Amino acid sequence: MSRKLFASILIGALLGIGAPPSAHAGADDVVDSSKSFVMENFSSYHGTKPGYVDSIQKGIQKPKSGTQGNYDDDWKGFYSTDNKYDAAGYSVDNENPLSGKAGGVVKVTYPGLTKVLALKVDNAETIKKELGLSLTEPLMEQVGTEEFIKRFGDGASRVVLSLPFAEGSSSVEYINNWEQAKALSVELEINFETRGKRGQDAMYEYMAQACAGNRVRRSVGSSLSCINLDWDVIRDKTKTKIESLKEHGPIKNKMSESPNKTVSEEKAKQYLEEFHQTALEHPELSELKTVTGTNPVFAGANYAAWAVNVAQVIDSETADNLEKTTAALSILPGIGSVMGIADGAVHHNTEEIVAQSIALSSLMVAQAIPLVGELVDIGFAAYNFVESIINLFQVVHNSYNRPAYSPGHKTQPFLHDGYAVSWNTVEDSIIRTGFQGESGHDIKITAENTPLPIAGVLLPTIPGKLDVNKSKTHISVNGRKIRMRCRAIDGDVTFCRPKSPVYVGNGVHANLHVAFHRSSSEKIHSNEISSDSIGVLGYQKTVDHTKVNSKLSLFFEIKS
């Protein structure tokens, strides 16, 4: 859900909090006393944008421009949450989502006593009315006044408003008055900026640890979280909608007006914005139109800019798979951070919102491609984009749904940094030489408790004698095969990374299949190979002030 929508929700809740001391009945209508509390050294988490990770650690300051936390004047404030993974979802710059960059997450703490006032409703006017507040002054500004704190603070130094992301959700969002927020101490939790254009990749890995990348939790009940969405149904719905949209008279006419050739970005965006406006009038996009009308980020201009950017990346010969993934998942209309496509879905009809969003996004990208690159078949391009998006979501999240795959290893697992790795069989730990051909070696990987990421694997090679078969090396998560991208990083080492995020733990296992190719029957001696181990890389950690990936080494034998 967007900050603006959160603001509305918080306003409704506040109305119940601000009732005069003599009007507790009204306050009870908007304040949830069972979830309100006073706490010493109250802490929460905040996601910060690229370029601000260092400055925010110096203290919280109200921005001089921009939304200042929310589009709605009543809800302008400093936002934080009790869930650090949810906070990470706000670390991407919405103005430049295709940069691949992300900011970070900080932990913020108030000194002394803080009253957390939990709200029930989302209408600012109602909240102010029920709490006996001024109807003309912004809600969050009144929350920071001495009068408000005296009436509702229960002896605390400040009042922070809270609101659940959705009915049944355990996550909570906090709204802090800007002046009060200056008292917050700031501690860095995680920094994605150090990864440069791979920052969003690191952010996705971090968020998926708790499946919190599904910002849909902010707007719908937990029963409709990303884990439980039926992607097969969404795929069918999306394709049906695309066919209906394509054949709709006004949309068909608008498509015929397309320049259908390479044009300037300005002309491409102008056409796509008009296409967006026309498409939203179709009944198949009625739910999405409602969301668009309440959330500025869904405006046609943003959709158009997003579609052009995605089309440019897809058309680029130099863009690697990660860059294309970043483009597809950029936090803009239609597609968001892992589950951002449903961001702002307030009608508890998430599946429909997702289908409508993907349908419109796919059509707009298909329309944009010939404007910035090659001419393509609109239907084919749209369907291909649908499959790419759905497949990516399934790869990230389906591992948490699929039945556990446990091949039964015959060697003792190596435990380190929360991971457990082992050769699947004793034979897998032996690299035999003296013949030409292929050999495969399986490694079982899991985590002891919390889901942890698999960043890749380092494989020793001998050019011309022992090479990695890149097309056959892959990783399977609970039986689902995921291809890997391999490249030589040194003359005798090859690094392979999954083409999609991979996590293990809590019943989710991975099987890494390493394939070697020998083009010569010449024997290999131990002193010819740079390392007698295969290194599995996990999460990033800091050692002696240097960031490194957790590494688990499995030793092998070379035999003739």
Curated annotation (Swiss-Prot):
Keywords: Cleavage on pair of basic residues, Disulfide bond, Glycosyltransferase, NAD, Nucleotidyltransferase, Signal, Toxin, Transferase
Enzyme Commission number(s) of this protein: 2.4.2.36
Annotated S-S bridges: 211-226, 486-496
Annotated GO CC locations: extracellular space
A Pfam family reported for this protein in Swiss-Prot or TrEMBL: Diphtheria_T
GO molecular function, a single term: nucleotidyltransferase activity
Active-site residues per Swiss-Prot or TrEMBL entry: 173
Signal peptide: 1-25
Residue sites binding NAD(+) per the record: 46, 90
Catalyzed reactions per annotation: diphthamide-[translation elongation factor 2] + NAD(+) = N-(ADP-D-ribosyl)diphthamide-[translation elongation factor 2] + nicotinamide + H(+)
Subunit composition and interactions: Homodimer.
Function: Diphtheria toxin, produced by a phage infecting Corynebacterium diphtheriae, is a proenzyme that, after activation, catalyzes the covalent attachment of the ADP ribose moiety of NAD to elongation factor 2. Fragment A is responsible for enzymatic ADP-ribosylation of elongation factor 2, while fragment B is responsible for binding of toxin to cell receptors and entry of fragment A.
Protein name: Diphtheria toxin
The species this protein was found in: Corynephage omega
